Amino acid sequence: MEARDIILRPIVTEQSMAEMDNRKYTFEVALHATKPQVRKAVEEIFGVKVVNVNIANVRGKKKRQGRYEGMTRRRRKALIALSADSKEIKIFADEDNDKK
């Protein structure tokens, strides 16, 4: 399995943005991904040293559209802590490069 298939997208919330100052990043990962696979994928993609990986399964929520009821899809998110000597992950592109 490719590293890009394991790490799907960053999760951008107020809480996850605040944790970035402490070198903790939150990503949505594949449903079948394990902690060692997530660690290896992050180290391979971003070139950083991972200290800890925590994973949480998020249940789908019930949603209604008129009289029809359905479920949102379930997700799996990983909270990744980096070592103090590793570089930070650039999730957003620099605005200076976009303006050129």
Curated annotation (Swiss-Prot):
Biological processes annotated in GO: translation
Transport as UniProt keyword: no
UniProt KW Metal-binding keyword: no
UniProt keyword terms in alphabetical order: Ribonucleoprotein, Ribosomal protein, RNA-binding, rRNA-binding
InterPro entries membership: Nucleotide-bd_a/b_plait_sf (IPR012677), Ribosomal_uL23-like (IPR013025), Ribosomal_uL23/eL15/eS24_sf (IPR012678)
Xref: Pfam families: Ribosomal_L23 (PF00276)
First and last residue of the signal peptide: none
GO molecular function: rRNA binding; structural constituent of ribosome
An example Gene Ontology CC term for this record: ribosome
Similarity annotation: Belongs to the universal ribosomal protein uL23 family.
Subunit annotation: Part of the 50S ribosomal subunit. Contacts protein L29, and trigger factor when it is bound to the ribosome.
Function: One of the early assembly proteins it binds 23S rRNA. One of the proteins that surrounds the polypeptide exit tunnel on the outside of the ribosome. Forms the main docking site for trigger factor binding to the ribosome.
Record-given protein name: Large ribosomal subunit protein uL23
Species of provenance: Lacticaseibacillus paracasei (strain ATCC 334 / BCRC 17002 / CCUG 31169 / CIP 107868 / KCTC 3260 / NRRL B-441)
Gene, per the UniProt record: rplW
